[in-house]
Amino acid sequence: MPIYTPEEYPAVIERIKAKIAQKNISMGPTISETEIAAFESACNTRLPQAYRLFLLEVGDGWNDPAAEGIASPIHRLAEIERKDLSRPMTLTDGWLWEDEEDEEQLSDESFERKLGNQGVELMDEGCGMTYELITAGPCAGEVWSFSDVGVSPCCERQDFLGWFELWLDSDGDPDYFKDYVYKEDE
């Protein structure tokens, strides 16, 4: 699942709707442009177009208590923490701070410079692992994995629609890192 182009969005949205119906998944209701704009205003950001279309045309979040332990819920916009998302994440590749030997790279300033304000938390997998939609910086629009040891883009790199479609196709247990190869800086 790639990062789709805006021209592909209508077909991808329709394909996702068909898969949701086929799998009998109960999405949260769609939300209005006004609700999206209120979130954006509160967080000082503009949500990526793919995610906005999903909220407007497909639904807002997913939570099936009967599927507990099978798949984590996808947060509804109203549940997402309101924080300033205007500072960009400057990373373009993964960063494992657990392996970092340079103490300067582990300073609060370094974290803030590299991670900005992170992103919109889409899903909490537990054990310190979340999936977040990056809203500012060179990777804006991509979904990244955040954990207690580092951050990395999903591989192949995915926007929200690609990330969600892979989740659908894998019955809630996707391998978002199947092609990821971490490269140490030399």
Predicted regions and their residues:
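A surface-exposed partner-binding patch
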Residues: M1-D124
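Intrinsically disordered or highly flexible coil/loop and linker segments, enriched in small
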Residues: I25-S26, G128, D173, F177
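Short, low-complexity intrinsically disordered segments
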Residues: D60, D93-W95, E142-W144, L161, ...
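Intrinsic disorder/low-complexity segments enriched in polar/charged and small flexible residues
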Residues: D64, W97-D99, F146, E165, ...
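Short leucine-rich amphipathic alpha-helical surface patches
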Residues: D124-G126, L168
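Segments surrounding the PLD/"HKD" phosphodiesterase catalytic module and close analogs
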Residues: M129-G162
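Long, compositionally biased interface segments
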Residues: C155-E186
